[in-house]
């Protein structure tokens, strides 16, 4: 370690400007460009590159993980020594005053060394210290300080403030050391000598499961944080601590049982408060309604099991990046009635107008909502009072919540924080403090409920608009695993076997269809793609293992349900199974080569360019299975093709329509949708009535996307002003032509990235499928599809977590204008005066809309915190669906399900007695217009099914399960009985009503 400079080289400590505080910023020394030590504040780099920070008195150095070593010899001035003798600070009792070294920094690693010994460590999250100076310093012994700081990779580093602060040990403060702060408190209240309200104080430690550290670090941070909190409870009798995230408690229960037992005892004693809710602090705009429901079901079930003495009516999500409009419906159905967040204070444009309000979903369910105090705070009395005044002015409530504790990477409250709280507890100028549980605080807010404003919209975060597009691999993993888990649950119900039997869904952790792997990866810094590379590298094998387990579990259950093929049969029997209760439709699939028959009827086939053949299946309605027989020889004449694809050449030089290149313009259609191809690609699209959809050709565009501090989180607001080149190589080529499937291919380059676009139209399909494959090699670029609309949209709709939301196409208000990019989970649709155009997505994407345009953000390439984010081979799949009526009558939500959830196709199992394999095997009828199946899973205690259905339309709908099922009881979202159903005793089909946008739950049983 370099030696500290001598006292003669530094400004005299007597230059301190206050009796109670000495500013150290001018006194630090560092190596200058000439290699000599000099004042750190005078280093030329800061004034040149960060004049804004330099003007604030910060010590600054460059970003990129660079270290800066600061040195200072700290000497107690004679007048302070005299003050200490006067106060008795040097006697054995230790009464009088104390001195603390108060530091604040912006650095990702910090070490404070005093006389060669390290006394404190910090980082980007533990950003301050108040180290108590030893008694020897008061006696004139200088302290050699060395402060080692490393700048963040993404931002310049700074020592924000440094000072020695004197504090009285006697609450009476006979020396007036607190006078300056007391005057500041009075100034905040415009001269009022005393406060009219008080604080409710709860220690807290926000703990991200992964972010700038891998998950393994989180377990260690949780262990340290909870152990520290329990130790502080023994030292400070008033100390109460609250923490969320059942996933963390579950890890402690399994891996640190002794610590978890201490937590349970502290919970029983009313000092440690689990403020849980969902399984993790998940993203709430990129996950489906089914996943959000399961988040709450798993979290609530765990909380009720391990903390049985508490009511669990709280969703604590302080840091999640916005919330879908349907969130209240799902949360309230699972026993939650309070919702707390802080993130909307991050709005970059329009401050959120409420601190305390009622948040109502479109179905009428609502939550009481609290915008909490900041997280990661300390016990600074001025900051506390400033917040309390803002809270009281905004809410009308005199009692403000305060949450001291180091956050993000854990840590929680420190002893220094509570010593400072105790110091100010007895000061008349400071607001009184009440230490207690969050539940008690919320209970005292309950009387305000009737007078609270009602918010009937999504909670859109005006920031972090790039999260829906960054790291598409995580969105793809999430979509696939969720589908497999839902299918495994449904298959277990169809198989009719207990939850613990192989091939059926399990409800306990560690079983094959344990949802908790998926739920954990939906954490709000993993699924959005805003973590370091190690997080995603370590998640990859977990994704793969969970997919394989869920797939195996589903297949076993489906084979158990369907039985086996006839013994001794010559032709292989296959099953084509639809696992969503959708309306009847004929689908075209690519199957292994051969002649395929159903019920003795040969099915229409067409050779496929990628191998095998295209086959049009008979209509499948609801959840059902078709038995298909594969033969090597041709049977009788095939069945007629429904809505065959026809290709027509419109103009151009000599050449047949069957040539392998498109030389001019071609028209492609199947009676449900038609398109025109030309030199500019897809130049027009028509619906079934021949209404044109495009005002100009589809535009695949590339932009510069740079300059944002939160790189992986934020789209550049000015990206449209910085277009980049995109070139197509040659003409469009036909990949295959035929009545069942016709597809074209176009290749090109955008910068260093090779691009392949495939368009595909199948018989009887109402949409044009587009698949963009990209070898993405970019930095700070954005890839988008822009769709110019022929019919101007008045509004536009998209699905969101918990439901559907419609927005005005023409943004008028500042809040509407701020929503220039929003997340969509699986579809968006324009809403003109009649008809419209829908875009079906294969997973969450960032989307946008104006009256004349729909847009989809496809790929980004941020460099922080993951330098290689998004780069590599990417496959993006979407479809264009013209609507002859609005999106509701066109059943766009159901079409989106059909688009992204393929049929299950497997050979039948052998070794069985003969059965009748002619007709389809029905399981669950189509739910009906506007209804979506969220879940059908086995009951863990009975041989029943638990079904959750959502009405995705603004009209009342009726669910009819048909003769094969009886309804046992209506449930809430936690499987508790709300109402027994008696009408099933009459052996008649039951019609179950769902109000607009409503979610309902039932226990059902196969007849």
What is the predicted function of each stretch?
Residues 284-305, 372-392, 742:
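Alpha-helical scaffold elements lining the catalytic groove of polysaccharide deacetylases
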Residues 2-36, 40, 162-200, 482-594, ...:
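Histidine-centered catalytic/metal-binding microenvironments
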Residues 189-201, 221-236, 251-311, 322-333, ...:
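Catalytic alpha-helical scaffold of carbohydrate-active enzymes acting on polysaccharides/glycoconjugates
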Residues 1-80, 86-88, 283, 524, ...:
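Extended carbohydrate-recognition surfaces in non-catalytic/accessory domains of CAZymes
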Residues 206-212, 217, 365-565, 834-908:
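Catalytic grooves of carbohydrate-active enzymes
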Residues 104, 109-161:
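Beta-strand-rich ligand-recognition modules
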Residues 81-116, 575-579, 589-590:
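Aromatic-lined ligand-binding clefts that engage carbohydrates, nucleic acids, or primary amines
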Residues 327-330, 346, 355-356, 371, ...:
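C-terminal (or distal) subdomains of carbohydrate-active enzymes
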């Amino acid at each position: 370690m370099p030696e500290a400079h001598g006292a003669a080289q530094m400004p005299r400590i007597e230059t301190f400007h206050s009796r109670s505080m000495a500013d150290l910023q001018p006194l630090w020394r560092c190596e200058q460009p000439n290699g000599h030590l000099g004042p750190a504040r005078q280093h030329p780099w800061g004034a040149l590159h960060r004049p804004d920070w330099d003007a604030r008195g910060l010590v600054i150095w460059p970003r990129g993980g660079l270290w800066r070593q600061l040195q200072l010899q700290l000497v107690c001035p004679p007048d302070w020594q005299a003050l200490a003798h006067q106060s008795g600070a040097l006697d054995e009792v230790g009464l009088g005053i104390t001195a603390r070294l108060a530091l604040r920094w912006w650095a990702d690693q910090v070490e404070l060394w005093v006389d060669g010994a390290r006394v404190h460590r910090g980082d980007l999250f533990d950003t301050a210290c108040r180290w108590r100076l030893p008694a020897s310093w008061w006696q004139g012994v200088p302290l050699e300080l060395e402060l080692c700081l490393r700048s963040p990779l993404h931002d310049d580093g700074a020592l924000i403030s440094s000072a020695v602060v004197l504090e009285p040990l006697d609450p009476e403060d006979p020396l007036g050391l607190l006078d300056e702060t007391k005057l500041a408190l009075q100034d905040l209240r415009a001269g009022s000598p005393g406060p009219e309200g008080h604080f409710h104080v709860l220690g807290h430690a926000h703990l991200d499961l992964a972010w700038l550290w891998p998950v393994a670090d989180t377990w260690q941070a949780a262990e340290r944080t909870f152990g520290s909190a329990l130790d502080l409870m023994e030292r400070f009798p008033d100390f109460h601590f609250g923490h969320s995230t059942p996933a963390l408690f579950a890890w402690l229960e399994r891996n640190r049982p002794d610590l978890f037992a201490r937590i349970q005892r502290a919970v029983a004693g009313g000092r440690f408060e689990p403020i849980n809710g969902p399984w993790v602090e998940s993203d709430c705009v990129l996950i489906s309604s089914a996943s959000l429901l399961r988040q709450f079901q798993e979290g609530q079930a765990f909380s009720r099991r391990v903390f049985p003495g508490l009511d669990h009516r709280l969703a604590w999500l302080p840091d999640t990046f916005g919330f879908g409009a349907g969130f209240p419906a799902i949360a309230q159905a699972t026993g939650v009635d309070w919702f707390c967040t802080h993130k909307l204070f991050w709005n970059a444009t329009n401050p959120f107008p409420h601190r305390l309000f009622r948040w109502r979903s479109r179905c009428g369910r609502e939550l009481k909502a609290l915008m909490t105090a900041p997280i990661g705070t300390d016990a600074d009395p001025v900051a506390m009072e400033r917040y309390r005044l803002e809270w009281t002015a905004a809410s009308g409530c005199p009692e403000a919540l305060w949450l001291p504790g180091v956050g993000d990477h854990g840590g929680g409250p420190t002893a220094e924080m509570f010593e400072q709280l105790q110091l100010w507890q007895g000061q008349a100028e400071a607001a009184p403090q009440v230490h207690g549980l969050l539940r008690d605080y919320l209970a005292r807010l309950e009387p305000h409920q009737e007078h609270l404003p009602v918010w009937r919209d999504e909670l859109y975060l005006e920031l972090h608009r790039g999260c829906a597009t960054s790291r598409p691999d995580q969105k793809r993993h999430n979509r696939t695993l969720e589908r497999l888990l839902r299918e495994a649950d449904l298959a277990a119900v169809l198989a009719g076997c207990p939850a613990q039997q192989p091939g059926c869904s399990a409800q306990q952790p560690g079983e094959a269809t344990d949802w908790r792997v998926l739920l954990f990866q939906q954490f709000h810094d993993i699924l959005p793609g805003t973590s370091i590379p190690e997080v995603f590298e370590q998640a990859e094998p977990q994704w793969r293992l969970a997919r394989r387990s869920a797939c195996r579990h589903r297949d076993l259950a489906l084979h158990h349900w369907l039985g086996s093929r006839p013994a001794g049969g010559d032709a292989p029997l296959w099953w084509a199974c639809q696992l969503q209760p959708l309306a009847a439709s004929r689908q075209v699939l690519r199957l292994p080569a051969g002649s395929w028959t159903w019920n003795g009827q040969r099915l229409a086939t067409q050779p496929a360019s990628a191998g095998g053949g295209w086959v049009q299946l008979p209509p499948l309605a609801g959840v059902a299975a078709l038995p298909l027989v594969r033969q090597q020889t041709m049977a009788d004449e095939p069945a007629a093709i429904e809505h065959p694809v026809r290709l027509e050449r419109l103009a151009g030089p000599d050449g047949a329509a069957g040539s392998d290149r498109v030389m001019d313009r071609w028209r492609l259609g199947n009676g449900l949708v038609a398109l025109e191809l030309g030199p500019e690609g897809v130049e027009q699209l028509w619906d079934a009535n021949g209404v044109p959809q495009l005002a100009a050709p589809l535009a695949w565009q590339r932009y510069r996307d740079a300059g944002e501090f939160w790189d992986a989180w934020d789209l550049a607001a000015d990206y449209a002003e910085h277009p980049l080149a995109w070139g197509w190589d040659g003409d469009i080529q036909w990949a295959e032509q035929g009545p069942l499937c016709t597809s074209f291919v176009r290749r090109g380059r955008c910068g260093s990235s090779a691009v392949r676009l495939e368009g595909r139209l199948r018989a009887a399909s109402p949409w044009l499928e587009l698949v963009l494959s990209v070898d993405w090699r970019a930095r700070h670029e954005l890839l988008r599809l822009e769709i110019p609309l022929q019919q101007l949209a008045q509004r536009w709709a998209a699905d969101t977590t918990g439901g559907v939301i419609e927005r005005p196409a023409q943004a008028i208000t500042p809040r509407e204008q701020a929503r220039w990019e929003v997340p969509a989970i699986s579809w968006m649709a324009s809403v003109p005066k009649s008809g419209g155009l829908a875009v079906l997505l294969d997973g969450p994407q960032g989307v946008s809309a104006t009256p004349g345009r729909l847009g989809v953000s496809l790929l980004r390439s941020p460099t922080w915190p993951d330098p290689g984010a998004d780069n590599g081979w990417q496959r993006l799949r979407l479809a264009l669906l013209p609507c002859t009526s609005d999106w509701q009558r066109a059943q766009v939500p159901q079409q989106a399900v059909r688009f992204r959830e393929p049929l299950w196709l497997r050979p039948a199992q052998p070794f069985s007695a003969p059965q009748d394999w002619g007709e389809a095997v029905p399981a669950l009828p189509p739910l009906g217009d506007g209804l979506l199946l969220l879940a059908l899973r086995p009951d863990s205690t009975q041989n029943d099914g638990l079904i959750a259905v959502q009405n995705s339309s603004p009209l009342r709908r009726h669910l009819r399960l048909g003769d094969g099922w009886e309804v046992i009881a209506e449930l809430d979202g936690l499987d508790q009985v709300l109402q027994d159903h008696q009408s099933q005793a009459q052996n008649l089909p039951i019609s179950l009503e769902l109000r607009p946008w409503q979610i309902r739950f039932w226990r059902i049983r196969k007849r």
